[in-house]
Amino acid sequence: MELNKGKSLLAGVAVLFSGALLTACGQSKGASEKLVLNWMTSAEIITMDPSKATDATSFTQMENTMEGLYQLDKDNQAKEALATKAAQSKDGLTWTFDLRKDGKWSNGQAVTAKDFVYSWQRTVNPKTASQYSYIFSGIKNADAIVAGKKAPSSLGVKALGKYKLQVKLDHKLPYFKLLLAFPVFFP
């Protein structure tokens, strides 16, 4: 009789455990649609401003929450992110990028070519004092703008349409796509 009580108790525990497991795995109809991601960093995030960032933690967080024209794949090769297509002129000095139309800011507004123009002009503007403005060297007029000799609006970047961006270079940059994956070039 003791054996039957033990089997009954074991069966009861198994049924309760199975029920609890199935209840935990099931999704109720009233479940919230809101998804939350908790993220930890090894250090305080100094800024999420691409023009102002200088530390690895800030750059890592931007890479995890934003996109530029390109991103680096597992082999550190540039692959399209917000860019869907890139065309380079025969002389290698003009690049034209078509942007994804589904790119959105956190408030739901579309990411457009004008956002890139604004961000890049802001980064090279001496008033912004970006420590990474030098990395724009090679883009038309960037060096003169950083030196305070030309207006930021003369930077070789232009919105040709809502989702079409043109970049003019002073000289060929064989590594240009790789540069565009760096957060300083994010919108």
Annotate each language-model stretch with its function.
Residues 2-11:
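Bacterial N-terminal signal peptides that target proteins for export
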Residues 61-64, 77, 81, 111, ...:
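Extracytoplasmic/secreted proteins, especially bacterial periplasmic and envelope-associated proteins
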Residues 85-132:
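Aromatic- and charge-enriched surface segment that lines or borders ligand/interaction sites
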